[in-house]
Amino acid sequence: MSNDVEKRINDDLQAFSQDTVTFMQRRPPKTDAAGNPTTGATLFSQEAIDSKAFIAARDSQRMHILQGEGGETRAAIASNDRAENLVDTFKYNKLADIESAGLMQATLAESPWSDDYWAIYKGILGARYADPSFPASADWKANHDYIRSNPASAILTSGSASRINKLSPAEKYDALVGDANESLTKAGWAEGKSYYDMHGEVESWMGICHGWAPGAYMLGRPLKAVTVKTPNNVPITFYPSDIKALASLLWANVAPATRFIGGRCNDKEPATDSATGRTTSSQCFDTNPGTWHLAVVNQIGVSKRSMVLDVTYDYEVWNQPTYAYSYRYFDPQTRKYKSKLDEAMISMASFTADKFRAFRSPNTKFVVGIQMTVSYVVETRPSHREEDNPSHDAIQQATYYYDLELDADKKIIGGEWYQNLHPDFLWTPAKSARAQTAYDAQATGSWAQGSPLPQAWRTAAQSASKSQSAPLAAIVEHLIKFSRAGSTPVPAPTPAPTPVPTPTPTPTPIPTPVPTPTPTPTPRPTPTPTPAPTPAPAPRPMTWWERLLARLLGR
C-alpha cells in the first residue's frame, strides 16, 4: 500500500476524532476508476438537492415497509438486514477467513454495462437521442411536441437510412414488430403526460435506473450494432445503446421478484445522537456495516456477481451496479492504519476511546476498523457507437469508514458507520431470474437475423407493449445474441478511463421540484393474458411506481 493511502486513512480518522459530528455528515468523495477525484453523477436538480426532495424519491422507489418505527437503535444485524438473504452464496463471516481466501479485494470479470437512465421527461425510450434537432428540453411538452411534429411513420417511409436510424429505441422497436399504433413509444410519452398534467412539469430524476441497474448484469452486453428488417423489409439498425435501452425497460417494467436488504427511510432530518451525530432512527440506520461487509465480500468476492447499491442521503449514489471492492484495516482505539488484522482488532474491554459504546451489541467482544473502497457503474449518454466494450463504461468509487463488531468466536455480528451517508439498501434479482412479459410464451417459432419477425412474435410483442409497456423478452434477448455473434467480450481495462457521469442535460431551467410527484399507488399485479391468438383487452398499464412495488413485494 502506498504511503499516500495510509496518510489519507490516518488524516481522515484524525478528522473523525477531532470533530465526529462534522465527519459523520461528510459526503464520501468520489473518484474515477484510476483514483482521480471526480464529480459524482446525480439525476437530481439543485432544487431537489437543496430541499432534500431526493430522499422522498428514493423512499417511493423502495416501497417496503419495515416492522415499526421504534425499537432498538443498537447496531446489531436486524432481521431485514441479513447478508444471507441477499447473496447468491454465503460462505464467510469471519475476517480471518476472508483474508485467508484472498478476498480483501475483488473485481468482477467484466463490469456491468453503462447506459442512460432514460428520463421520463424526454419520453423514456421515445427520446431521439441521436437526432440533433430533438430538443432534449427540461420541458416534457417541448420534447413531445417535436415528436408529434416529426412522426416516425413519415420517417420510415422516407427511404432515408440516416433518418430511420436516428429514430428513438422505442420507435425502432415499434417498427420492428409492425406496430402501426406505436404502442411502446406512446406508453413512454404517456408516463410523462400524467405527471405533466398534474404538476406542469416532469421531475428530472424520474426514469428507469431501477431497470438499468439489474439489467446491466443480468443480461449480456450488446457488443455491436445489429441491422434487422421490419415487416415491410425496411432495414433498421439497433446500436448497442438502443439494445441496452430495451433491456433496461424490460427490467424496469416486468422484472421478477427482487432479493434485498435494508429498508425505507423518508426522514429528511432523522434524529441523531448529539455527541456523535450518529443517526438514531432504526429505519434510517440500515444497512448495518456488518451486513454491508458480508454482502460485498460474499456477493462480489465469492459469488462473483454484482448487486445494486443505494445510499439514501447521498444524491450522487442511486441504484448503481457494483463492480469491485477493496478494504484495509485500522485500529479503532488509536484510529491509525494497520496492515494486519490482529493489530487492528481490539477487545471491548480495552476499547476506551469508543464513541459508539451506547449503541454496541451486548454480544460484541472485539472491534476492528475498516476502510472500504467500492467501485460501481454510473450512467452514460447513449450514442450511435457501432461497438461497445467495458472501456466505454463509467466507473466511480466511493470510500466508507466503519468498524465491525465481532463475537467471542470472532464472527461479524454488527458494527458502526463513521459516516451517515453510507450504503443502506442493497438488492439484486436471483442469479437465474429472467425478466419476461406475460406474452412471451406466445412468441412461437424462430427468428433469424436476416428475416422479419414471425407473425406470432409480432402479435405477442404488440400485446406486451399495450398492456405492460414493455418489450418482449425474446426480442431483447435475440438482439443481444445477434450483437454478440462472432464477438469475443473485451475485458475491462485497468485502470478504466475517466468516467463520463451524466447529470441530466437541461437546456432550460428545471422548475422547482415537487417532493412527492405522485401519491403512493395501490400495487396492481401484472396482467396475465390467456394464451390465445387474440388476447382479451388488458387493463391499463401500471405506472413505474406500481411496477416497482409489485417487484419488491414479489407479486
Where are the language model's segments positioned?
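Active-site-adjacent structural elements in enzyme catalytic domains
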Residues: 2-444, 448-454, 458-463, 467, ...
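Generic low-polarity alpha-helical segments
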Residues: 292-296, 534, 551-555
